[in-house]
């Protein structure tokens, strides 16, 4: 693989400085972290399934997943405080760029009828979140090893507080956004 971090340092930073008209290189937007999270939903009661979900995310990310717990009890959802409700992984630096490259080059092209990811996932503060419906698009996941099919949320946190700059950064890094109609 070419190395997305090297690509960012060599080419993307120069294009960003030119297109966004930023003179100070320290003010250029950069990717700070990627958070991969899964909510277990109805499967939260079964600890074996929770462990399987955490193991699957660990395989995908290349880093150990943390099982998230409920902060407070919600009777309507039959959730108690401290009960396992999902799993997440926070990726930074080398693992973050490796995951992003794998996502762009290998995983997203494996999505059936893929036409690009939505441009509507920006939160107004320069962060971008999108969802994946199935974990089987990742090459590390073996179909026979999963107990339940689940999707995941992927959040990309950037150093900028501007959605326009964050979009330009992610677009130059190669994220395949859907065409505007």
UniProtKB/Swiss-Prot annotation:
<dbReference type="GO" id="GO:0005840">
    <property type="term" value="C:ribosome"/>
</dbReference>
<keyword id="KW-0689">Ribosomal protein</keyword>
<dbReference type="InterPro" id="IPR002132">
    <property type="entry name" value="Ribosomal_uL5"/>
</dbReference>
<dbReference type="GO" id="GO:0019843">
    <property type="term" value="F:rRNA binding"/>
</dbReference>
<dbReference type="GO" id="GO:0000049">
    <property type="term" value="F:tRNA binding"/>
</dbReference>
<dbReference type="InterPro" id="IPR020929">
    <property type="entry name" value="Ribosomal_uL5_CS"/>
</dbReference>
<dbReference type="InterPro" id="IPR022803">
    <property type="entry name" value="Ribosomal_uL5_dom_sf"/>
</dbReference>
<dbReference type="GO" id="GO:0006412">
    <property type="term" value="P:translation"/>
</dbReference>
<protein>
    <recommendedName>
        <fullName>Large ribosomal subunit protein uL5</fullName>
    </recommendedName>
</protein>
<keyword id="KW-0687">Ribonucleoprotein</keyword>
<dbReference type="Pfam" id="PF00281">
    <property type="entry name" value="Ribosomal_L5"/>
</dbReference>
<dbReference type="GO" id="GO:0003735">
    <property type="term" value="F:structural constituent of ribosome"/>
</dbReference>
<keyword id="KW-0699">rRNA-binding</keyword>
<comment type="similarity">
    <text>Belongs to the universal ribosomal protein uL5 family.</text>
</comment>
<dbReference type="InterPro" id="IPR020930">
    <property type="entry name" value="Ribosomal_uL5_bac-type"/>
</dbReference>
<comment type="function">
    <text>This is one of the proteins that bind and probably mediate the attachment of the 5S RNA into the large ribosomal subunit, where it forms part of the central protuberance. In the 70S ribosome it contacts protein S13 of the 30S subunit (bridge B1b), connecting the 2 subunits; this bridge is implicated in subunit movement. Contacts the P site tRNA; the 5S rRNA and some of its associated proteins might help stabilize positioning of ribosome-bound tRNAs.</text>
</comment>
<keyword id="KW-0820">tRNA-binding</keyword>
<dbReference type="Pfam" id="PF00673">
    <property type="entry name" value="Ribosomal_L5_C"/>
</dbReference>
<keyword id="KW-0694">RNA-binding</keyword>
<dbReference type="GO" id="GO:1990904">
    <property type="term" value="C:ribonucleoprotein complex"/>
</dbReference>
<dbReference type="InterPro" id="IPR031310">
    <property type="entry name" value="Ribosomal_uL5_N"/>
</dbReference>
<comment type="subunit">
    <text>Part of the 50S ribosomal subunit; part of the 5S rRNA/L5/L18/L25 subcomplex. Contacts the 5S rRNA and the P site tRNA. Forms a bridge to the 30S subunit in the 70S ribosome.</text>
</comment>
<dbReference type="InterPro" id="IPR031309">
    <property type="entry name" value="Ribosomal_uL5_C"/>
</dbReference>
